[in-house]
Amino acid sequence: MQTTDLGNKESGKIWHRKPNPSTNEGIIVNIVHVDASHPSKSARFLHAGFDSAGDSFIAGDHLGNVYLFNLNRNRFDLVQKTMQACTAIAFNLHRRTEFLVALADNSVKCFDTGAKELVSWMRGHESAVTSISVHPSGRYAVTTSSDTAQLWDLDTFQRKRKLNVRQSVGIQKVFFLPLSNTILSCFKDDSIFAWESDTLACKYQLPIPEDGTKLRYKAFAITRDGRMLAAGGKSNNLHLWCLDSKQLFRIIQMPTKVRSVQQLEFLPENFDGGSSQILGVLSQDGIMRFINIQTCKLVFDIGSHDNGIVTSSVSPNGRYITSVMENGSLNIYSVQALSKELNKPPPPLVKMVDLSKDKDSTGNKSGVSGASQEKVRVSSGRTCRPWKSKDQIVRTKYLRPEDTTTSEDKENTLPAGLSKQRLQALLKGFGEYPAKYRMFIWRSLLQLPENHAAFSSLLDKGTHTQYKLLHQEYPIKSRKLLRVLQRTLSALAHWSAIFGETKYLPLLAFPFVKLFQNNQLICFEVVATVITNWCQHWFEYFPNPPINILGMVENLLAHHDKELLQHFINYGVTSQVYAWPLLETLFSEVLTREEWLRLFDNVFSNHPSFLLMAVVSYIISSRSPLLHCNQKDDFEYFFHHRNNLDIGNMIREAYHLMDTSPAEIHPRRLLSDFEPLTRGQYPIFNKYPKFIVDYQGQERERIRQEEIEYLRERQLTHKVEAEAVKRRLEDEAWYQQQELLKGAEEQRRKLLMDEEQKLLHQRQRLATVKRELRLKELQLLDAARRRFLRYQQDQRKMELRRLDDELERKMSLRERETATIAKDVEIRQMELEAQRRFFEQQLAKEQEAVTQEVKGEMDANRRRADLEEQMFWRLMETEEDLKDKKLLEESLAKAERLCVETDWKIQTLQKQKCDDQERGKRYVEVSKMTDDVREKERELCDVLKAMETRKWAEVSEKMTQLETEELASSALRAKRNQFLQERLRQEAEPVNISEDGNEYFERLRDLSRNSTQNDFSSSAERHVAENVCLNDVSASDSSTHFSLDRGRGELENRERALISEVRELRQKLATQARRKYPQLHFSETNWT
């Protein structure tokens, strides 16, 4: 069993090697969908549906992906992503590329597989759609949910009608009946109604069984002819309804292990006329059992208890079954492989038949009137082949009525349950079988075994050598028909060697091939059956026509129409002219299609001798035109072309000949009765002169070898002849080429001389042109040089003008500034003069006021002046020392900061330079010597570590030096403060302290923070109060006082804050450097 993973592919092959499904499982391929990104998660398929042809189907998973699988082309394609899980799918619309999908949001969408686009979106359901049924024409669809069913027009995608029911009842399923305009609705109370799809008028209602056989219907299936309905539910019983009589005609009981039916599907078969006999029953255990509803035999089953089936879909052609498994995968089964064992003659299966025919009482109770119900029990054991878990073999047991059957009835009973006598009576009454059931009747009459395995083995042998060039002898327009004819003839030739030598076999088989071109197995078996029964003794005189058979025809014609036979003899027309063309073509040349089908309805329904009677009947029915023929070509033309003939009269004449011909000349005496082909393997066909066929085969092989040798010699001769002709042509071409070369050489010499003369003239003209160009170039260069000099001169003039303008502007600006300053100076002088005059006035007033006190205060003023001068100069010296020290400290701090920054920059540059140099070296060394890389790296690391140690040592020294300088600065500052305090204390001792003075030394008191300084300032104030300065105008509180402090304390605070900021800035720079270049060493680097 092959397994295909779709993965994330949007298209690809379904299987990668030729499928070889086993007869035990029948699985062609198992399809899974695993997400490549999440291998543990896989998409689960939910539903699948085939198209109307049965060779393609679509399947949707729970992620909303819809795939198209083409089994003929072995290809799958992702056609749509709906992003929602699907609840139902339909793919049999009238537009082959469109499909319907019901989604989890209660909507139904129509998509196109070719364009991969949304065609329409249909809404209207309030609950999930459980099924979609499409009309046989593909133009209407019925969607069913639990509460409503809606009819849609697929041309306009508009809703036409809507079926509503009571919530207590509920809808189970609504679907179209095939081959009709009837809609069947099934409800949860087991009631079934039929509606006319055009008018939606109720046509009929199936009666509800009331004898305790309620099944609570859940699953339904309808045959292709729409005449039989199968229903099942929560029981192991199946109800089969005949929709023509509206009666329940059979109840099938499944094995006890089947407790409920989940799904029912009829399996279509070829030439069953739509009345399928195989019903697939999916039960609750996940196994789908296919049973024959007529014989109640278990045909085959699919699925297992380990991995059961959720839902299945059967292709309309009956070749494939697609099943969605419990694990979310998709299995594709081959019906041919599953039913291959059925072609072998198996032992009988267990069948328990219980016929209860209570026409009156049962019919009145159950509402099924005038019909008999047959209850059949299906056994679970089988003996034809081992099936999975079925290990019990139950012996066959038949329960039949006690009435006996005669041998005649046994002969007239066909395998499909048809009566040959009734068919013959029908044929005599109507003259032909119904066209609808003709293939099914022929298949039953011929009792075809359908040996799939044997036929496949014949096809596997390929095209027979005799029929490889069939298209040349029979140019058929239809390539398909030609291919089927070629395969059928090749299979016949592989079956028996005589058919490879029979020239008229294509003519004999062609009408059957054209009739059964869609089923090659049936075509082959029909032709083989015709050959083995209706072509008896044809090949005994091979390769001559069957003289014995033609003799029978001639004897019959002599008995029934001697005049016509004498006419043939008079003109030399033998039976090979008037009988053999009809037999070798089986009347296909002289009859139309309808006439031929009517004829063979009678041929297949009678003894093989009827075909010879039909030949004689055709000749006798055409005696009038034949008696008027007097040339042999006319006779040959007559029996190879269509003629005006009443086929009904001909067939009646054939029956008359069958009844009135004497026994001694009747073909029945020499021809055997009908014998069908054997099942399993085809019978041996050796009724021909084998030595002639072998001799012809040998002769043909010899002729073929001679033809091959002749062709080889002819090819060799042609090759030698072609070589000689080629050499002769080459010699002639060489001589012609030599002559042409001589003429061309002379012509080229003349042309060369002419060209040389032209070249000389051109060179002279070129030299002249060059001289002219050179002169022009010199003139242009001179003009350009002059133009450039002028340009430079202009530029310089412009620059000079610009400089002159700038000078003038600056001069005018300077003059304006000078005038402004002069005006400002004059105004300032005026202000100073005014202030001086104001002060002089003030001084004059004050001097006049204090003139009387000048003498008394001169001494005090002198002493106070000396004291102030002494203190002022002392304080001035101290402040200058402080300023010098402050400048020194600021300079030192700035120098240290610059030193650190410079060292850091130098180190960074050195590191970068070293890194660049070492990196360049490494690149060179890596390209040259790979083995020395690691050693160089270690050396480099050592060097870097040494540099790191050295640098960090320098940093430590710098930091130590900085701390030393800070300590020295702090010591100097403390020493300076102490010196000032001592000096102030020494100066404050001889001064008398007075508490009544003014606040002359208020700033000096702020500097002195201890008690000594307070005493000193108080004594100074008292002393000043006693000795009033001459310039002091007023001693009141509002007068202005002169301070000698000049903000020394504030300067000290600024100094400390500045040093602190410098320290913090240095720390920040160091931190940033460490972050940018951590630890100032490099780790070992791996070069690649």
Curated annotation (Swiss-Prot):
Gene Ontology molecular-function annotations: molecular adaptor activity
Renumbered ranges of WD repeats: 33-74, 75-116, 117-157, 158-200, 201-248, 249-296, 297-334
Coiled-coil residue spans: 736-903, 1048-1076
The keyword Coiled coil is assigned to this record: yes
Domain of life: Eukaryota
GO biological process, one term: cilium assembly
GO CC annotation terms, alphabetical: centriolar satellite; centrosome; ciliary basal body; cytoplasm
Protein name (record): TBC1 domain family member 31
